[in-house]
C-alpha cells in the first residue's frame, strides 16, 4: 500500500526482498525464531533457577545440607575449644561464616556477577564444542561395534558395578583435567581466574573461565565414555546407572557437603579418611598460596589420585591458617568480569606459553 502511494512497484516473486519476506513468514523460520528466543530466555533465567536443578551445587537440598553440616562442623569446633566461648553460639556462627565481611567482599561480588554472565555465555560460546560420555560411547560403538539391545534387563549388580566404575572414571577424569590446568603453563593462565578469588563462598565454585570449564568437561567425558561403551559392549546394552532424583547416586552423597569446599567452614575427615577421600578442608588448602600448599589436593572426591601423583596434603583436624589468592602481585588484574574473561588471553599474548610459569614452577610465587 505504501509503495503504491509512493508510486513504487510492488516486489515481484523474483525480487530478493519478496523471497526474504516469504521466508521470514514461513513455518520453518517461525520455528527457528521461536527456538532462538526460547533458548535466549532460558539461558537468561537458568542461573536464577539453579536451586531447582539437581546438577547444580545450588540445588536446594544441597544448600540445606550445606547449612546443616556447617552448623555441625561449627559445633564440633566449639566443643574442641577452638572458638571464643564468651561469644553467644549464634553470633559466633554468624561472624565466622555469614558475615558481610565474607559475603559482601569485593571478590564475592565479582563471583556473583561472573556467575550470571558466564551461565548465559558459556552454553552459547563453548557449548557447541562440548561432547558427552554418551557421545564418546556412541563413537566407540561405531568404530568397534555395539551389540543389539538385549531382551533381558540388566541385573541390580550390573547396574551397581556400572554406577561405581562410572564414578571412579568420572573422578579420575576430573583429577586429570585439574592437573592439566595446573601443570600446563598456558592452561594455568585460564585456571588463574578461579584461584584469583580472595575469599571463598559456594559461588566461588562457578568462578571459572570458559576455557577452564571446557577442559574440565572434555576429559571426564572421555573417561566415562570409555566405561559406558565397555558396559554396553560386554555387559548389557540397556544398562543404566543407579540415580537418586535424577543424579548419580554416589555423586549425590558427595554433593551434600560439596558447597563446603568453597566456604570457610573447616571440615576435615580425620587422619584415616583424609588419605582416601577429599574433604572440604583439602580443597580450601588447594586455594592457598602458601609454599607448602602450592598445587596440592587436586582431586574432587577421591584422594587416591593425589596420593599416586604426589600432590596430597592431608589437612589437620584443627583449622590451618593460610592465605588465599594468587600471591603473585596480580590481584589488581582480576577485579572485573571483563578482566576475568580477557586477561588470560592478554597474558598469553604478552608472554609465550613457554615463558609462562605454573604455581609449581620456581619463581612464580
Language-model-detected regions and their locations in the chain:
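Short, strongly hydrophobic alpha-helical membrane anchors
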Residues: 16-52
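Short, low-complexity, charge-dense intrinsically disordered segments
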Residues: 2-13, 23-24
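A membrane-cytosol interface segment of integral membrane proteins
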Residues: 319-365
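Membrane-interface segments at the starts/ends of alpha-helical transmembrane spans
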Residues: 37-57, 105-108, 149-157
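Short, charged cytosolic
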Residues: 30-36, 80-97, 179-195
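Membrane-interacting alpha-helical segments
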Residues: 34-49, 113, 117, 257, ...
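Membrane-embedded catalytic scaffold of the fatty acid hydroxylase/desaturase
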Residues: 117-129, 141, 148-322
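Specific transmembrane helices
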Residues: 57-146, 162-174
Amino acid at each position: 500500500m505504501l509503495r503504491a502511494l509512493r508510486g513504487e512497484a510492488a516486489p515481484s516473486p523474483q525480487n530478493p526482498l519478496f523471497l526474504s519476506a516469504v521466508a521470514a513468514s514461513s513455518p520453518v523460520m517461525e520455528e527457528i525464531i521461536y527456538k532462538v528466543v526460547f533458548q535466549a530466555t532460558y539461558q537468561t533465567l537458568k542461573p536464577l533457577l539453579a536451586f531447582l536443578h539437581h546438577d547444580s551445587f545450588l540445588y536446594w537440598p544441597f544448600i540445606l545440607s550445606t547449612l546443616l553440616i556447617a552448623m555441625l562442623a561449627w559445633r564440633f569446633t566449639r566443643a574442641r575449644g577452638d572458638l571464643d566461648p564468651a561469644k553467644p553460639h549464634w553470633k559466633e556462627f554468624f561472624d565466622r561464616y555469614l558475615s558481610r565481611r565474607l559475603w559482601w567482599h569485593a571478590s564475592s561480588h565479582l563471583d556473583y556477577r561472573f556467575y550470571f554472565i558466564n551461565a548465559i555465555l558459556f552454553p552459547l560460546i563453548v557449548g557447541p564444542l562440548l561432547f558427552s560420555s554418551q557421545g564418546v560411547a556412541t563413537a566407540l560403538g561405531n568404530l568397534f561395534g555395539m551389540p543389539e539391545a538385549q531382551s533381558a534387563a540388566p541385573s541390580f549388580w550390573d547396574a551397581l558395578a556400572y554406577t561405581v566404575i562410572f564414578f571412579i572414571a568420572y573422578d579420575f577424569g576430573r583429577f586429570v583435567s585439574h592437573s592439566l590446568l595446573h601443570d600446563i603453563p598456558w592452561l594455568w593462565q585460564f585456571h588463574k581466574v578461579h584461584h584469583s578469588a580472595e575469599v571463598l563462598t559456594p559461588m566461588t565454585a562457578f568462578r571459572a573461565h570458559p576455557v577452564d570449564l571446557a577442559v574440565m568437561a572434555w576429559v571426564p567425558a572421555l573417561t566415562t565414555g570409555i566405561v559406558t561403551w565397555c558396559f554396553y559392549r560386554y555387559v548389557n546394552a540397556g544398562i543404566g546407572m543407579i540415580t537418586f532424583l535424577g543424579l548419580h547416586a554416589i555423586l549425590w552423597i558427595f554433593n551434600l557437603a560439596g558447597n563446603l569446599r568453597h566456604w570457610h567452614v573447616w571440615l576435615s575427615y580425620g587422619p584415616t579418611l583424609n588419605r582416601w577421600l577429599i574433604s572440604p578442608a583439602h580443597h580450601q588448602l588447594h586455594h592457598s598460596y602458601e609454599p607448602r600448599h602450592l598445587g596440592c589436593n587436586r582431586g574432587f572426591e577421591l584422594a587416591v589420585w593425589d596420593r599416586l601423583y604426589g600432590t596430597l596434603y592431608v589437612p589437620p583436624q584443627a583449622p590451618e591458617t593460610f592465605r588465599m589468592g594468587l600471591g603473585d602481585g596480580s590481584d589488581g588484574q582480576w577485579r572485573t568480569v571483563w578482566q576475568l574473561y580477557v586477561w588470560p588471553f592478554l597474558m598469553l599474548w604478552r608472554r609465550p606459553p613457554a615463558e609462562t610459569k605454573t604455581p609449581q614452577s620456581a619463581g612464580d610465587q
